[in-house]
Amino acid sequence: MDRELVMRFLGTGGAVPSKDRSHPGLLVEFSGTKLLIDCGEGTQRRAMEQGVTIHDVDAVLLTHHHVDHVAGLLPLATTVDLLHGRRLKVYGPTAGSESALDISDLEVIEYREVNPGDEVEIGDLRVLVYESEHGVPTVDYRIETPKIPGKADPKYIRRVPPSKRREVLLRGERPYSLTKPGKISVYVKGDGRPADPENVRGCQVLVHEACFEDHEEAVRYLHSTHLEAAEVAREAGVDLLVLTHLSTKVDPERMREEAREVFPVVVVARDGLMVRVRR
């Protein structure tokens, strides 16, 4: 089984894109399974520029239906239909009255509504759904791999019959295992007020929106700041915090330095960033 989950940040901007930051799009890959979280304008082109194929994704996970998160969905679904002759599987919350796209009327999309508390198995990944406060139906996603066996010690594993080795490594028995067994978990925060640290606990990586630097502005528009994201990361005990969905108004370098005063391991995402999470 693969021991690595890869996250590729296709778009890291806010509602207004810039020359450096496009509308949101995050590709998660593990053991042949591909999930695309949100699909803003131009997502296919950005993937091509980064040398990534997304027309073979297993599913798209929408955090909500604002236009900056869904404008690239119909073009991608059309590509999937033309190249593969199938409908694009899309999961997300109820569209609501502010939806930018009436997905239910699109023949090239197979839409499944998810709600907070739901769990979905997609390929080799398990997806848990949590509520986000954003004024419209919005969700966060916790993505987990299956349990990964401990890494074998070649000096000792030969003593175990081949048919028993996986069982031994899944238990993490010493001296046969060099590492403890476990799973990879990442939490992707949809637009909205800060994530609940209890929902994030146990994850290695927290991807959190940081649309604003100013707290009052974040509260007014139901978004989050970099400092609030850092507080969540500290309370949840993650290994890495990645800030994304940045407004054109913010200073990314200042945000990173200020966030590091609260939580030490912070990366401000940029379009093209790749994060590898190993077990």
UniProtKB/Swiss-Prot annotation:
<feature type="binding site">
    <location>
        <position position="134"/>
    </location>
    <ligand>
        <name>Zn(2+) 1</name>
    </ligand>
</feature>
<feature type="binding site">
    <location>
        <position position="245"/>
    </location>
    <ligand>
        <name>Zn(2+) 2</name>
    </ligand>
</feature>
<feature type="active site" description="Proton acceptor">
    <location>
        <position position="68"/>
    </location>
</feature>
<comment type="function">
    <text>Zinc phosphodiesterase, which displays some tRNA 3'-processing endonuclease activity. Probably involved in tRNA maturation, by removing a 3'-trailer from precursor tRNA.</text>
</comment>
<comment type="similarity">
    <text>Belongs to the RNase Z family.</text>
</comment>
<comment type="subunit">
    <text>Homodimer.</text>
</comment>
<keyword id="KW-0255">Endonuclease</keyword>
<dbReference type="InterPro" id="IPR013471">
    <property type="entry name" value="RNase_Z/BN"/>
</dbReference>
<keyword id="KW-0479">Metal-binding</keyword>
<feature type="binding site">
    <location>
        <position position="191"/>
    </location>
    <ligand>
        <name>Zn(2+) 1</name>
    </ligand>
</feature>
<dbReference type="GO" id="GO:0042781">
    <property type="term" value="F:3'-tRNA processing endoribonuclease activity"/>
</dbReference>
<keyword id="KW-0540">Nuclease</keyword>
<protein>
    <recommendedName>
        <fullName>Ribonuclease Z</fullName>
        <ecNumber>3.1.26.11</ecNumber>
    </recommendedName>
</protein>
<feature type="binding site">
    <location>
        <position position="64"/>
    </location>
    <ligand>
        <name>Zn(2+) 1</name>
    </ligand>
</feature>
<keyword id="KW-0862">Zinc</keyword>
<feature type="binding site">
    <location>
        <position position="191"/>
    </location>
    <ligand>
        <name>Zn(2+) 2</name>
    </ligand>
</feature>
<keyword id="KW-0819">tRNA processing</keyword>
<dbReference type="Pfam" id="PF12706">
    <property type="entry name" value="Lactamase_B_2"/>
</dbReference>
<feature type="binding site">
    <location>
        <position position="69"/>
    </location>
    <ligand>
        <name>Zn(2+) 2</name>
    </ligand>
</feature>
<dbReference type="InterPro" id="IPR001279">
    <property type="entry name" value="Metallo-B-lactamas"/>
</dbReference>
<dbReference type="InterPro" id="IPR036866">
    <property type="entry name" value="RibonucZ/Hydroxyglut_hydro"/>
</dbReference>
<keyword id="KW-0378">Hydrolase</keyword>
<feature type="binding site">
    <location>
        <position position="68"/>
    </location>
    <ligand>
        <name>Zn(2+) 2</name>
    </ligand>
</feature>
<feature type="binding site">
    <location>
        <position position="66"/>
    </location>
    <ligand>
        <name>Zn(2+) 1</name>
    </ligand>
</feature>
<dbReference type="GO" id="GO:0008270">
    <property type="term" value="F:zinc ion binding"/>
</dbReference>
